């Protein structure tokens, strides 16, 4: 992948860009194998890869510059702004949207937030596109609601220019810190969820719910989890840290008793909407802390699926999984190092199968799916 920003030295986010892509996959696989070298792995599967450019469905843009000439991109530590509108990780559909949004910022008088001076209102633009419908979700991250009336008044022009905008909201983030969003979300459109679809499974994205940024590889990840789980012929499962329900909804058959747990109420609303669309009758999605739910629950499912944040599932949940002893644990991880530490705390389980998913080309990061079977 050629990137003018990388060549110019203005953006080095893709730290492995100069490394040939086959070598990237080899290095990631070797890293994963080294982390699990102390455990026997019955089956190592080949890494799954997708497109090397234009694969992202989401842009997180710092807004800087002036209201007349805004920049969308990132800030270096010294405060230097870099416009990332031409980043080759974004699909071709993003560039014209960025152009319109720059005009809109000026038209609506949304002064970019100046970090050094602690002045201005518009901090970030967050853009997500559905590969299923082409619809787009747009979030304005503001320091306060001072410019909210101006934003609302100018929106009809923006919606006329970009009819693909289905979900628009404003997020209020008042803190002078590099935090992407605050707790308060203000819907600006009647529609509040963007529909996506992977492998004929409808999924919904709300403003404050997490969703994978590489749809092509994410669809492969979910499909692989589905195939592994259905081969086990189970009839009950937990999906912990379930997000919008992607894993559980892929794996569940109509008769499967599925419990999905996620701390985010927004994500749970999405999961419930998907389950309703699919007509699944034996599904229960709840907005709870996954560890607290598991350790307080009396029943034992046949399979527990975990998809934790980068920190992993931790000692408390590992200890409880050892105690409750489900037949299978399916572990999906965005941080193989924390996953390896967790697996060390699951001595009663053997590693049946491992597969790497290259969700983040040109970086050292990747996702991994591991099937653990009770001894």
UniProtKB/Swiss-Prot annotation:
Enumerate the InterPro entries for this protein.
23SrRNA_MeTrfase_RlmC, MeTrfase_TrmA_AS, MeTrfase_TrmA_CS, SAM-dependent_MTases_sf, U5_MeTrfase_fam
Mind telling me which Gene3D superfamilies this protein's record contains? 2.40.50.1070, Vaccinia Virus protein VP39
Q: Which UniProt keywords apply?
A: 4Fe-4S, Iron, Iron-sulfur, Metal-binding, Methyltransferase, rRNA processing, S-adenosyl-L-methionine, Transferase
Report the function annotation for this chain.
Catalyzes the formation of 5-methyl-uridine at position 747 (m5U747) in 23S rRNA.
Q: Where is the active site?
A: 334 (nucleophile)
Instruction: Give the catalysed reaction(s), semicolon-separated.
Output: uridine(747) in 23S rRNA + S-adenosyl-L-methionine = 5-methyluridine(747) in 23S rRNA + S-adenosyl-L-homocysteine + H(+)
EC annotation from Swiss-Prot or TrEMBL? 2.1.1.189
| Chain positions recorded as [4Fe-4S] cluster binding sites | 3, 11, 14, 87
**Gene Ontology terms: biological process:** rRNA base methylation
* Sequence similarity: Belongs to the class I-like SAM-binding methyltransferase superfamily. RNA M5U methyltransferase family. RlmC subfamily.
Q: What does the record list as coiled-coil region(s)?
A: none
* Protein name (database record): 23S rRNA (uracil(747)-C(5))-methyltransferase RlmC
Give the top-rank taxon of the lineage listed in the UniProt record for this protein: Bacteria
Upper lineage = Bacteria, Pseudomonadati, Pseudomonadota, Gammaproteobacteria, Enterobacterales
Tell me the PROSITE patterns matching this sequence.
SAM_MT_RNA_M5U, TRMA_1, TRMA_2
